């Protein structure tokens, strides 16, 4: 009976360790995914800012060409 208790304890312990490792890997992959999404959002906002400046640059160039 003592052998069965030790075996059961070992199985439960190894299962918990395995579960803990899997949860940690899942958490790390979710963090990486969130960081990647945040980087993508920042890149898109930078692109939008640059695209918004194009009409301003065109009007500045046309104003300079009218002066010269």
From Swiss-Prot:
Miscellaneous section: The primary structure of this peptide is identical to that of Medusin-L1 (AC P0DQK9) and of Medusin-AS (AC A0A5Q0MU22).
Propeptide intervals in chain numbering: 23-49
Signal peptide positions on this chain: 1-22
UniProt entry tagged with the keyword Secreted: yes
Recorded coiled-coil stretches: none
Protein name (database record): Medusin-C1
Compositional bias segments (type: Acidic residues): 31-41
Region annotation (Disordered) ranges: 25-48
Biological process per Gene Ontology, one example term: defense response to fungus
Keyword presence, Secreted: yes
Domain of life according to the entry: Eukaryota
Family: Belongs to the frog skin active peptide (FSAP) family. Medusin subfamily.
Modified residues (Leucine amide): 67
Function comment: Antimicrobial peptide with activity against Gram-positive bacteria (S.aureus, MIC=8 uM) and fungi (C.albicans, MIC=32 uM). Shows anticancer activities. Shows weak hemolytic activity.
Tissues in which the protein is found: Expressed by the skin glands.
Pfam families listed in its UniProt record: FSAP_sig_propep
Intracellular or extracellular location(s): Secreted
Main location: secreted
Cellular component aspect of the GO annotation: extracellular region
Keywords per UniProt: Amidation, Amphibian defense peptide, Antibiotic, Antimicrobial, Cleavage on pair of basic residues, Cytolysis, Fungicide, Hemolysis, Immunity, Innate immunity, Secreted, Signal
Organism: Agalychnis callidryas
């Amino acid at each position: 009976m003592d052998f069965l208790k030790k075996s059961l304890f070992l199985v439960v312990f190894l299962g918990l360790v395995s579960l803990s490792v899997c949860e940690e890997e899942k958490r790390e992959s979710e963090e990486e995914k969130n960081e990647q999404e945040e980087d993508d959002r920042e890149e898109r906002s930078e692109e939008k800012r640059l695209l918004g400046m194009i009409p301003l640059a065109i009007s500045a160039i046309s104003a300079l060409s009218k002066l010269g």
